[in-house]
Amino acid sequence: MDVEDTVKKLNLKFRNIEGERLILAITCDENKNVLMVAFMNEEALKKTLETGYMHYYSTSRKKLWRKGEESGNVQKLIKFYRDCDGDALLFIVEQKGVACHEGYYSCFHYKIEDGELKITGEYYSKR
């Protein structure tokens, strides 16, 4: 697969966010549980397609990063989809370990209940 050609054919609508051309990346496991939402620039997308492992763009650190490069909790790409508008991508991955830097399987472990923010295992549990 020619990565340059694939990216071009996707006809993506990168958005200008904090001075960078970015696209929303939604990442799910094989059971379609949402693991995380992050941004990608074109380089991160190309690296993901070239290596088969998820790469993202950090808006806070202003750099490309490979998921799990420090923790070992890598995400192996299985397949991906483009949304109807071309402004978001959905990635299905094989998750090794946890996805969240706080030690939870998913970044969506906070629940809003009675106006309060609570950490809960109802949606995803710590593994």
From Swiss-Prot:
Keywords: Amino-acid biosynthesis, Cytoplasm, Histidine biosynthesis, Hydrolase, Magnesium, Metal-binding, Zinc. Its EC number is 3.5.4.19. Binds 1 Mg(2+) ion per subunit. Mg(2+) binds at residues 83, 85, 87. Zn(2+) binds at residues 84, 100, 107. It is found in: Cytoplasm. Gene3D superfamilies: Phosphoribosyl-AMP cyclohydrolase. Its cofactor is Mg(2+); Zn(2+). Its main location: cytoplasm. Catalyzes the hydrolysis of the adenine ring of phosphoribosyl-AMP. Belongs to the PRA-CH family. This is Phosphoribosyl-AMP cyclohydrolase.
